[in-house]
């Protein structure tokens, strides 16, 4: 029976059993194993080498180095046993220890060799020969020594006299040399003494010459003032002659209707009034006849003309207000504190007067303590010149003239008025001058009273051929006064130019607009652009009347100085002229050589650092000298000796105003008064709104205080401060200022990220596990598993209908399978043993095996039946089709109207299911707020190579494409990977921003508009973030803003009230812009130069402002900023003594006071500070270089732009000295003897020579212990007559 037949019988048996359900049938089955079919020799099995496993295992022996044959193994074991046995023996003997004895084999002994007689003889001969050789050497050596001693003895005897002669000659030569050296030293000492005496005589002569030059300068200043007074007197005398005064009008008019001057004239001479009254009475009695009609008409015309003339001339002298110059009033107030009888006259001289010396015409109530009053009205007294006697008795006496008796009283009155005019200065009150200049008809504007006086002052300068400085405070209209001057020259003098106006780059457009507005009749050339454009503008450069005014910048005039230098200018006007304060700079040297008839300097701060800068301006005005006799204004050394050094001592040492200091101040005023006009806004513009300054102290935040204390307490910082290195100290100061402004400027808040590891630890550890995991991932075992069979895929049944699924469940035959399986289990004998090849149990065992196989097959069929019949979908295809057939939402009008009438129609559509199913993007959007608030935990470390380890089977192209897709979880993953600092910490990390927040809320809510100034560009970025956080609208202006954009931003801020804040850089927003739309100025930090802050605040507090201006200065408490503010207040002391706007000297503040900005307690640091006080200090150039090195790159660039435009451009206005090779022969007072006599050496050379003389004097005192005797006097007189060694 074959295998197929047996299978058929089995199937038939099974079916029969199912049908009959009987088990009595017995079947005997015999199986025969078929023979293998051999088709190849390889199919024949070989005979086994070993019969069984034990024989195979006994065929080899496994050792450490591999498997061996049993015989080889025995030999190896035997050798190993012998080796270990020897090792044990050596160990017992101690050979393996360090103390083991080492036994050396002895050399074979030669005792067995016999010694013969000949050997003894030869050894004796060798010993005797060695002994004789040694004796011979000893005797030869002894003989050489003896012979040498004998030769030396006889040589000494033969050369004794010659040696003695040589020694004597050597001694004489040495003595002569020393004597000559002493004589030469003595002559050098005498020569130094002669030079010292010559230097003293030269210094005395120079001092005398300097006094004479100062006297000449003072005399010239006095002459200029007297010349102006004479011209004013002539005009007044011509206008107030006897014929011009209508005494009838004065007598008949009530005193209430007359002005002060008319009352003065009316009651100045009672005798003249009585004579006029008597003449009128005589005329009334004599003139009784009536006049003809023609005579009446002529008389009416004469009366009308006389009345008009009287009104015009009376209006010219209606009121005379006594206004003294600001410097004079400040001096008077200062002197009044010391003594009541110290008075300053117009020329600044101090006159000590007694009370009884003052004329009786002056009221006793007019005491000198009234010097603080701005107006001194003329009193109704018998002599109007008494007030001038109060100020200057000598000047008043000089002005008395001989007049006839009839006009004595009237001329006394006129002289009093003219003398009083000598002390008048404009201050904004209505002043009408006798020689008032009419506004030119070309000028399209209106001048205020003080501007009218400024025009008259400028005109007087031009008429006297004198150059001057218009130093009005910023915002008083220096530009419009200059334009009016040029219009006056064109109208009255027929002088149409050409005029050159040099201005900072930032205000070029402003000057052009002012000219077009107020003087449209002039042709204006605005010189700017690239080199090609400037070349085109120079076409017709030397043709007359091509244009009248050329406006250019400091930078361009230096670049194209050749064409400007060759052209002849009528007026050269420099705006912001304090930028030529350094006479060593190339800018000063170039502009000095320009061919200009007149020069005018416009500046709001004539003094910024020291009086040397003022000398630079004055010398620039008068390079040819104040008079024809003098070749220059004054050399620098003399000017410093006259004014600078006394003022420095006065300010630095805090001395009181003694008579010597008062005299120095008065002389300085006399020198400056003819050339300088200075008015303050508070003095000339009474309607100007008030200005209030507030200092707001801000506490440092916790982070600021930590960074500040940490930096100042570092060992490195203490070393730098103790070393005294200027650049390093400035750098430390800048770092502390950054901490005070905002801690992020010093140290940014870190952005926390996870530490990224390129290689994970799992890549190096558990290699076997990693290989297995890689193999499984590579083979993709999930593809070999039928998950649907295991019913793990629940969505495979969604294609079934729910009704079909129910039918399939009803066809499940689980119960039938259970009955058959129960029957088969009953037939199986569990206790049946395996077949033992016996006929008795083979049948039972075979039958039991058949039943077991049938049972297993039945169970498998049961499982398949249940699996196939139990497929039930989650939703079913019928439900899905129903959902797809639901009506969609309609947006038509009919649907909307119908739904309005029948709300139930809206039930056909629903968004409930749609809202339950959210996409990844929608879920990320809904959880955005939660993610932003709570996704804040950043892991300490992440591994980069994990995706590569577990995604080897994914192609790289696919990974790249997936990475380019927009990841909705990118924000969440980023927040978990990177922790950014909260933006609100920007405010809470800084004490100034917290104060600024409260301040802005109050100001903006009350309708104020704010200007915020800062020095650092990075602070502007922080302020922008701060304003954006709080939602304030703002504008920004810094050094990078173009000139055209500045004007647009300025006009937009002034015209748009919806922009409450304007943030600016002090170095760019402090010049050339008008921001009167703001009434509040906030200085976030203070600049190094207080004048820049003053310029910045005057952008708002100027003419045109209608509201009071409040200035807030934010200062960090207990920091270097507090010390800087204290120093700035001390620097403003000089303003009260010289002129408004002065400061301390640079040498006093620059280096020595830098250490004062730190709160130093250590003794070492105090010692360094004392050394720096005694040593030389840094000049302004080193100061600026140090600041440039310490500041940030953006701030350095902004500073360069600031210097370029007078606080806008560092490149142009940095005080760099000009190399000597660049200076022309006549371009500098340092290089031309004819230009500046006595100026051959600058201050540095003078100081070095002085130091040399001091050293010579000290050496002289050391060399000469005794006093100078008659021989010394003879030597001194000889050298004085014959000259020193360098003169031979």
Curated annotation (Swiss-Prot):
Q: Which UniProt keywords apply?
A: Activator, ATP-binding, Chromatin regulator, DNA-binding, Helicase, Hydrolase, Nucleotide-binding, Nucleus, Transcription, Transcription regulation
The record's GO CC annotations read: nucleus; Swr1 complex
| EC numbers, comma separated | 3.6.4.12
Localization per Swiss-Prot or TrEMBL = Nucleus
Name the source organism.
Answer: Schizosaccharomyces pombe (strain 972 / ATCC 24843) (Fission yeast)
| Extent of Polar residues compositional bias | 1208-1235
Residues that bind ATP, according to the entry?
472-479
EC class, as a word, reads hydrolase
What Pfam family is a match, any one? SNF2-rel_dom
This protein is called Helicase swr1
Q: What is the lineage of its organism?
A: Eukaryota, Fungi, Dikarya, Ascomycota, Taphrinomycotina
Q: Which gene is this protein's source?
A: swr1
Can you give the residue ranges of the HSA domain? 105-177
Q: Which Gene Ontology molecular-function terms are recorded?
A: ATP binding; ATP hydrolysis activity; ATP-dependent H2AZ histone chaperone activity; DNA binding; helicase activity; histone binding
């Amino acid at each position: 029976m074959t295998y197929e037949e047996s299978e058929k019988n089995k199937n038939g048996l099974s079916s029969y059993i199912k049908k009959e359900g009987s088990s009595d049938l017995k079947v005997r089955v015999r199986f025969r194993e078929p023979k293998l079919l051999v088709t190849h020799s390889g199919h024949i099995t070989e005979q086994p080498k070993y019969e069984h496993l034990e024989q195979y295992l006994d065929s080899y022996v496994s050792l450490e180095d591999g498997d061996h044959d049993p015989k080889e193994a025995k030999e190896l074991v035997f050798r190993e046993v012998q080796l270990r046995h020897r090792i044990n023996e050596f160990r017992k003997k101690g050979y393996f220890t360090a103390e083991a004895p080492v036994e050396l084999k002895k050399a074979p002994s030669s005792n067995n060799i016999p010694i013969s007689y000949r050997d003894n003889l030869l050894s004796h001969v060798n010993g005797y020969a060695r002994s004789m050789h040694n004796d011979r050497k000893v005797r030869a050596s002894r003989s050489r020594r003896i012979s040498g001693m004998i030769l030396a003895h006889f040589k000494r005897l033969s050369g004794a006299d010659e040696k003695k002669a040589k020694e004597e000659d050597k001694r004489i030569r040495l003595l002569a040399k020393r004597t000559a050296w002493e004589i030469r030293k003595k002559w050098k000492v005498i020569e130094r003494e002669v030079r010292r005496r010559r230097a003293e005589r030269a210094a005395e002569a120079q001092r005398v010459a300097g006094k004479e030059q100062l006297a000449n300068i003072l005399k010239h200043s006095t002459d200029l003032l007297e010349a102006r007074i004479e011209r004013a007197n002539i005009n007044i005398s011509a206008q107030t002659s006897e014929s011009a005064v209508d005494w009838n009008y004065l007598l008949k008019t009530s005193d209430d209707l007359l002005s002060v001057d008319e009352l003065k004239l009316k009651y100045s001479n009672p005798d003249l009034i009585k004579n006029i009254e008597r003449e009128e009475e005589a005329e009334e009695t004599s003139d009784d006849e009536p006049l003809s009609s023609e005579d009446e008409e002529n008389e009416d015309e004469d009366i009308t003309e006389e009345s008009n003339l009287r009104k015009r001339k009376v209006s010219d002298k209606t009121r005379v207000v006594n206004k003294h110059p600001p410097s004079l009033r400040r001096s008077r107030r200062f002197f009044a504190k010391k003594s009541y009888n110290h008075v300053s006259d117009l020329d600044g001289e101090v006159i000590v007067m007694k009370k009884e010396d003052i004329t009786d015409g002056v009221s006793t109530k007019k005491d000198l303590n009234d010097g603080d009053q701005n107006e001194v009205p003329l009193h109704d007294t018998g002599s109007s010149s008494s007030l001038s006697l109060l100020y200057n008795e000598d000047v008043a006496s000089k002005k008395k003239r001989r007049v006839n008796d009839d006009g004595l009283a009237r001329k006394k009155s006129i002289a009093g008025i003219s003398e009083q005019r000598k002390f008048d200065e404009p201050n904004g009150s209505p002043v009408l001058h006798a020689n008032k200049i009419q506004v030119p008809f070309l000028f399209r504007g209106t001048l205020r009273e003080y501007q009218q006086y400024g025009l008259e002052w400028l005109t007087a300068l031009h008429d006297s051929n004198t150059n001057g400085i218009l130093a009005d405070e910023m915002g008083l209209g220096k530009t419009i006064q200059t334009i009016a001057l040029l219009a006056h020259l064109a109208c009255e003098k027929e002088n149409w130019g050409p005029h050159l106006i040099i201005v900072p780059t930032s205000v070029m457009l402003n000057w052009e607009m002012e000219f077009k507005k107020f003087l449209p009749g002039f042709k204006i050339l605005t010189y700017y652009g690239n080199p090609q454009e400037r070349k085109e503008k120079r076409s017709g450069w030397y043709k007359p009347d091509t244009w009248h005014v050329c406006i250019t910048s400091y930078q361009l005039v230096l670049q194209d100085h050749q064409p400007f230098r060759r052209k002849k200018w009528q007026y050269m006007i420099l705006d912001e002229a304090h930028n030529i304060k350094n006479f060593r700079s190339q800018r000063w040297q170039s502009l000095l050589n320009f061919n200009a008839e007149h020069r005018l300097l416009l500046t709001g701060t004539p003094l910024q650092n020291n009086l040397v800068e003022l000398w630079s301006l004055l010398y620039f005005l008068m390079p040819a000298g104040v008079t024809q006799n003098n070749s220059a204004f004054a050399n620098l050394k003399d000017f410093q000796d006259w004014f600078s050094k006394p003022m420095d001592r006065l300010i630095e040492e805090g001395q009181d105003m003694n008579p010597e200091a008062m005299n120095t101040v008065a002389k300085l005023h006399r020198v400056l008064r003819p050339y300088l006009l200075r008015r303050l806004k508070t003095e000339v513009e009474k309607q100007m709104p008030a200005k209030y300054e507030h200092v707001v102290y801000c506490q440092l935040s916790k982070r600021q205080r930590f960074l500040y204390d940490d930096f100042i307490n570092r060992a490195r910082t203490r070393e730098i401060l103790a070393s005294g290195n200027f650049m390093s100290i400035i750098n430390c100061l800048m770092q502390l200022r950054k901490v005070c402004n905002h801690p992020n400027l010093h140290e940014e808040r870190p952005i926390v990220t996870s530490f990224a590891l390129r290689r994970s630890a799992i890549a190096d550890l558990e290699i076997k596990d990693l290989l297995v995991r890689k193999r499984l991932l590579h083979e993709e075992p999930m593809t070999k598993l039928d998950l649907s069979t295991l019913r793990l895929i629940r969505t495979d049944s969604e294609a079934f209908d729910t009704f079909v699924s129910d039918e399939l469940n009803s066809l499940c035959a689980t119960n039938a399978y259970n009955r058959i399986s129960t029957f088969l289990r009953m037939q199986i004998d569990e206790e049946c043993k395996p077949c033992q090849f016996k006929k008795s149990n083979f049948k039972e065992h075979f039958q039991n095996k058949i039943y077991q196989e049938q049972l297993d097959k039945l169970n498998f069929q049961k499982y398949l039946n249940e699996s196939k019949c139990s497929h039930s979908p989650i939703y079913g295809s019928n439900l899905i089709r129903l959902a797809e057939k639901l009506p969609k939402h309609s947006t038509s009008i009919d649907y909307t109207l119908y739904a309005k009438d029948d709300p139930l129609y809206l039930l056909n559509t629903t968004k409930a299911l749609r809202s339950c199913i959210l996409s990844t993007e929608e879920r990320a959007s809904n959880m955005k707020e939660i993610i932003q608030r709570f996704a804040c935990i950043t892991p300490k470390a992440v591994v980069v190579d994990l995706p590569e380890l577990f995604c080897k089977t994914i192609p790289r192209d696919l990974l790249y494409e997936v990475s380019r897709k927009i990841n909705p979880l990118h924000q969440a993953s980023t927040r978990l990977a990177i922790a950014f600092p909260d933006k609100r910490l920007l405010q809470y990390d800084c004490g100034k921003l917290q104060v600024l927040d409260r301040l802005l809320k109050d100001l903006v809510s009350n309708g104020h508009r704010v200007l915020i100034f800062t020095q650092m560009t990075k602070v502007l970025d922080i302020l922008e973030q701060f304003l954006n956080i709080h939602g304030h609208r703002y504008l920004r202006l810094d050094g990078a803003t173009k000139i055209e954009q500045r004007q647009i931003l300025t006009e937009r801020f002034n015209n748009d009230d919806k922009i409450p804040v304007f943030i600016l850089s002090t170095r760019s927003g402090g010049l050339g812009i008008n921001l009167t739309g703001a009434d509040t100025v906030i200085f976030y930090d203070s600049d190094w130069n207080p004048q820049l802050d003053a310029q910045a605040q005057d952008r708002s507090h100027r003419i045109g402002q209608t509201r009071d201006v409040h200035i807030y200065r934010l200062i960090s408490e207990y920091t270097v900023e507090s010390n800087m503010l204290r120093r700035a207040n001390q620097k403003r002391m000089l303003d009260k003594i010289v002129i408004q706007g002065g400061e301390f000297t640079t040498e006093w503040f620059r280096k020595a006071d830098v250490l004062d900005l730190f709160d130093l307690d250590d003794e070492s640091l105090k010692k360094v500070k004392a050394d720096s006080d005694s040593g030389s200090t840094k000049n302004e150039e080193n100061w600026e270089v140090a600041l440039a090195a310490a500041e940030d790159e953006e701030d350095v660039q902004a500073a360069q732009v600031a210097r370029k435009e007078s606080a806008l451009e560092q490149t142009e206005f940095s005080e760099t000295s000009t190399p000597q090779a660049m200076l022309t022969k006549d371009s500098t007072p340092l290089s031309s003897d004819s230009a500046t006599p006595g100026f051959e050496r600058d201050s540095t050379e003078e100081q070095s020579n002085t130091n040399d003389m001091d050293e010579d004097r000290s050496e002289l005192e050391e060399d000469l212990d005794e006093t100078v005797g008659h021989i010394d006097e003879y030597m001194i007189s000889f050298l004085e007559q014959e000259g020193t060694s360098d003169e031979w």
